Regions:
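Start-of-repeat signature of ankyrin repeats
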Residues: 34, 69, 102, 135, ...
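Ankyrin repeat boundary/linker residues
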Residues: 66, 99, 132, 165-166, ...
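Ankyrin repeat A-helix N-terminal signature
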Residues: 40-44, 75-81, 108-114, 141-147, ...
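N-terminal segments that cap or nucleate solenoid repeat domains
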Residues: 26-75
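Bacterial N-terminal signal peptides
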Residues: 8-18
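Leucine-rich solenoid repeat scaffolds
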Residues: 463-504
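Ankyrin repeat domain, specifically the short helix-to-loop turn at the C-terminus of the second helix
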Residues: 54-60, 86-94, 119-127, 153-160, ...
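Conserved ankyrin/ankyrin-like repeat signature
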Residues: 49, 83-84, 116-117, 149-150, ...
Length: 515
């Protein structure tokens, strides 16, 4: 069932290849398929003919099948005709008949969810498990719904609440949590479902493909609480935690329920997990903590909008504050470049946010002033750089960023100026440089932000500072292009003119040499 918005729940395979009445525009007549006239009659909803056949002498073979192994009982269950189901069972129809697709009357009845039909089938000896070809039991099918009455009936007749399907090793409890069915979760927990069961862990072989970027593959290994966290089922999470679910049990990538809830904008569920003592400082394989994720999600552009507001009562900013109050370390840094997300126009271009990125750098990149204030209040380090030498000040100024980036796409110059002021007041050095030797002024020039240029100059930044290629901020404002001719930095004539003017007004200091 599991991606990250993380892995999707496995879909039910079609249990009956002919289960749609409108499968063929021209219905098959009884005469056209003589070997199974009763099956054809029921399939075509010719219930009067079917009842007449059952009442006739000699009686028809109620175990007859069509070419795919489907019986009249299969179709009677599918059409939810309780009376016809009972007539067929009294006539000794095979209650456990399995067609070529692994479907039994019981597995189909679980899809329909009619308790009367289920009770009849069980009365006549149906296998309460009735797994399909993938090992999905009748209880698993019901667990995805809120049909608690039907599930109780199966459990009363011995259905295994800890059975696993063969595809991903998922249990009924996992299905219930993944589909946000708290009443079903409670029922399964009350009858002994394992709250810490884990689905199959996928060991993907390393492969080299024509696609140059690393591709994520579902790692599996989800617990019921991880499914609830991904779905944002707060009620499910409360039940599972009360029943003893491990709040910090991770998937193979180190993703905790708290982190997963946050990554999926499920802030109410994340806040609950913080309140019940989840470890706020656990990070995953990439070094993402819940705090980093909360800051990231708070201004993440999706769907062409500046952000995608969560439908939860808890806001992203409230979650950030809750995490900080609970002791979240504001200075944890990314260990690896984080995986791509299913985001609009996200092609992994956010290369600035790489190894060493802190929540403060991410907030500065997005111009998230409220989050920056909170992080600084709780001790965020303004000097910690990424491996590319990007500090919070340089991130705020736009260094190493691109219009192709996902994060910070809708940041404004006004936000950048406010972020710079905040950071300088908190101790950032105006002369900080990245791995290219560029200063915050180079970043402002990259974006053509004249007011930011003036703000930096007002704080005595060196307008003559050159990067490792000997370029001043004015040179950057002139624009650059790659060997193919595609502009990597758009030209900003007004910004270049402003910088040339400022350079003329300030004598080049001796220290303005290329670093």
């Amino acid at each position: 069932m599991a991606n990250r918005f993380r892995f999707g729940t496995i879909a039910l395979l079609a249990t009956l290849a002919t289960c749609t009445v409108a499968q063929a525009e021209k219905p098959v007549t009884v005469a056209e398929e003589e070997p199974a006239p009763l099956v054809i009659a029921v399939r075509n909803r010719d219930f009067a003919t079917a009842r007449a056949m059952l009442a006739s002498k000699p009686k028809p073979d109620v175990r007859q099948t069509t070419s795919d192994g489907t019986t009249a009982l299969h179709w009677a269950v599918y059409h939810n005709d309780v009376d016809l189901v009972e007539r067929l069972l009294r006539a000794k129809a095979d209650v456990n008949a399995r067609n070529d697709y692994g479907a039994t009357p019981m597995s189909e009845a679980a899809v329909i969810g009619n308790v009367k039909v289920l009770r009849l089938l069980l009365k006549y000896g149906a296998d309460v498990e009735s797994p399909n070809a993938d090992g999905q039991t009748a209880l698993m099918t019901l667990a995805r719904t809120n049909n608690v009455e039907a599930a109780k009936l199966l459990i009363k007749h011995g259905a295994n609440v800890n059975a696993r399907e063969q595809w991903r090793g998922q249990t009924p409890l996992m299905w219930a949590a993944a589909e946000a069915q708290p009443e079903m979760v409670q029922l399964l927990v009350d009858h002994g479902a394992d709250v810490n069961a884990r689905s199959v862990v996928n060991e993907w072989e390393r492969q080299v493909t024509a696609e140059p970027r690393m591709q994520a593959r579902p790692s599996g290994g989800f617990t019921p609480l991880l499914y609830a966290a991904r779905k944002g089922c707060l009620g499910c999470a409360k039940i599972l935690v009360k029943a003893g679910a491990d709040k910090d049990l991770t998937d193979p990538d180190g993703v905790t329920p708290l982190l997963l809830a946050t990554l999926n904008f499920n802030f109410d569920t994340a806040a609950f997990l913080v309140d019940v003592g989840a470890n706020v400082n656990k990070w995953d394989t990439w070094g993402r903590s819940a705090l980093y994720a909360a800051v990231d999600m708070n201004t993440l552009p999706t769907g062409g909008r500046a952000d995608r507001p969560s439908l939860d009562k808890t806001t992203g900013l409230e979650l950030i504050e809750k995490l900080l109050k609970a002791g979240a370390n504001p200075n944890l840094q990314l260990k690896l470049f984080p995986p791509y997300r299913s985001l609009r126009d996200d092609r992994g271009a956010d290369t600035m946010l790489t190894v060493g990125t802190t929540p403060l750098i991410r907030a500065a990149r997005g111009g998230d002033i409220p989050a920056m204030r909170l992080l600084l209040e709780y001790g965020a380090n303004v000097h910690l750089p990424t491996v590319r030498g990007i500090t919070p000040l340089l991130a705020a100024s736009g260094n190493a960023a691109s219009p192709l980036d996902t994060r910070g796409r809708y940041r404004t110059e006004e936000q950048a100026i406010e972020a710079v002021r905040l950071l300088l007041a908190a101790g950032s050095r105006i002369d900080e440089r990245d791995e290219l030797g560029q200063t915050a002024l180079h970043g402002a020039a990259r974006w053509g932000w004249n007011n930011l240029v003036k703000e930096l100059v007002a704080h005595n930044i060196d307008v003559w500072a050159k990067d490792k290629q000997g370029r001043t901020a004015a040179d950057i404002a002139k624009g650059t292009s790659t060997a193919s001719g595609r502009a990597s930095i758009e030209p900003h004539p007004e910004t270049e003119a402003l910088l040339r003017k400022l350079m003329a007004e300030a004598s080049p200091p001796v220290a303005s040499a290329t670093p």
